[in-house]
């Protein structure tokens, strides 16, 4: 039977595959005892172990985190993140309980919603492969088998208890991070487990000020090609000058981590600064001179500041005249935070643009026209970085020569060997000039008398 295709055959192949760009604007709070599973007094006794497989939650507001059951320092950090202006869209919270072998909790006096007045606190936790629960009547804990042995009163502080297990529900009490038992050797695997479940985050922070945990997070972060971390540096520590997170990342010349120093407890400058700056396009921002909401400024002396600055640390201070800002915005190695973030973004952009180009072409020839296609795509990626503000615009120097913000060097046929052609390998060199931010101005002038 005759068919129109005999005369006019039309076939359309869809070449619409696009590599997904990385995430460079979302923070993650690594929260031991996150307890974000939404349990309530009416449901916590009937929960099943399989309810707690997830190690993360994604939030668009602090209220959602509170509704899920987050409390104490973990919730304060979430609130600091979302309190910035403009407010960030997304925050990931990772259940970082594996970083503690035992978790300290403290009674808050806040009533357990829906419970009889005699119930002062309730808890649900996972130990091994078993879910356990208990409630506190003001004198003793009671609940599922083994619970009374797992929850031990702290002899050094009334109303505090050490819990042997991963806390997944908690009311009437909050986690006391500084009194919990840190397990720094488990940090890398704990973060990796969260990442394996959900990798759409860029900047890590933690509610724990335990130095061993902070160091382990910094070490893990430095090994990643698309992650950064920000830490609260406890300047009140008597060992700050010799052993602090600021000194650690400085001495190890870390580019992927930075710290903000404070003397104040429950002052989550890390979350506030991340929430303030991650909303901005990489390359368009500086992390210095930023005002922060839901955060307290420190009153450092000039000597204090010079000590912190010498280790490439950062502060949030009141400079008078209504100016309370962060400064100087540097990573452990002394590089500007925004420069490191931009370079990660630019590398990801170019890689994904090249991937998208090649998977949507039947063939790109290993010859001059093919090289031009590749170089044009790389220039397009660099132009995007220039438009974003991370690469300087073209300018004319003092000699009248045009200086380009970026350059892609075209390989010649003679430069490409036969072995490269046979294997399909190609090396293309490029360079660009970073567009740094002005953070300090010295204005020097003269006052003169006319006529002299």
Language model region names:
Residues 1-452:
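Surface-exposed assembly/interface segments
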């Amino acid at each position: 039977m005759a068919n129109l295709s005999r005369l006019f055959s039309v076939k359309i192949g869809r070449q619409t595959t696009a590599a997904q760009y990385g995430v460079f604007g979302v923070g993650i709070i690594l929260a031991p005892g996150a307890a974000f599973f939404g349990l309530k007094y009416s449901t916590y006794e009937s929960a099943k172990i399989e309810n707690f497989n997830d190690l993360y939650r994604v939030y668009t507001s602090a209220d959602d985190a509170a509704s899920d059951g987050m409390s104490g320092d973990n919730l304060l950090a979430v609130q600091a993140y979302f309190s910035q202006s403009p407010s960030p869209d997304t925050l990931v919270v990772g259940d970082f309980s594996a970083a503690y072998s035992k978790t300290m909790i403290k009674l808050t006096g806040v009533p357990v919603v829906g419970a009889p007045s005699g119930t002062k606190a309730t808890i649900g936790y996972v130990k091994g492969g078993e879910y356990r629960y208990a409630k506190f009547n003001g004198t003793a804990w009671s609940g599922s088998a083994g619970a009374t042995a797992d929850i031990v009163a702290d002899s050094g502080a009334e109303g505090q208890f050490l819990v042997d297990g991963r806390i997944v529900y908690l009311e009437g009490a909050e986690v006391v991070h500084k009194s919990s038992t840190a397990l720094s050797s488990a940090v890398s695997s704990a973060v990796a487990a969260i990442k394996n479940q959900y990798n759409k985050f860029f900047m890590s922070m933690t509610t724990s000020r335990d130095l061993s945990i902070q160091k382990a997070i910094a070490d893990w972060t430095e090994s990643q090609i698309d992650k950064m971390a920000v830490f609260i540096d406890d300047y009140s520590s008597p060992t700050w000058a010799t052993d602090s997170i600021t000194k650690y990342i400085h001495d190890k010349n870390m580019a992927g981590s930075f710290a903000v120093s404070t003397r104040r407890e429950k002052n989550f400058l890390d979350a506030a600064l991340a929430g303030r700056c991650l909303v901005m396009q990489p390359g368009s921002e500086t992390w210095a001179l930023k005002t922060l909401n839901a955060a307290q400024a420190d009153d450092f002396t000039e000597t204090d500041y010079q000590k912190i600055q010498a280790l490439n640390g950062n502060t949030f201070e009141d400079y008078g005249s209504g100016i309370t800002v962060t400064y100087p915005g540097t990573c452990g190695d002394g590089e500007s935070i925004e420069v490191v973030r931009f370079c990660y973004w630019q590398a990801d952009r170019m890689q994904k643009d090249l991937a998208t180009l090649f998977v949507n072409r039947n063939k790109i020839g290993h010859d001059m026209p093919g090289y031009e296609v590749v170089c044009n795509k790389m220039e397009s990626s660099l132009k995007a970085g220039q438009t974003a503000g991370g690469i300087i615009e073209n300018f004319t120097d003092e000699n009248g020569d045009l200086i380009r913000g970026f350059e892609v060097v075209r390989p010649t046929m003679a430069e490409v060997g036969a072995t490269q052609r046979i294997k399909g390998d190609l090396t293309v060199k490029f360079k660009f000039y970073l567009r740094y931010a002005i953070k300090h101005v010295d204005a020097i002038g003269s006052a003169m008398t006319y006529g002299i």
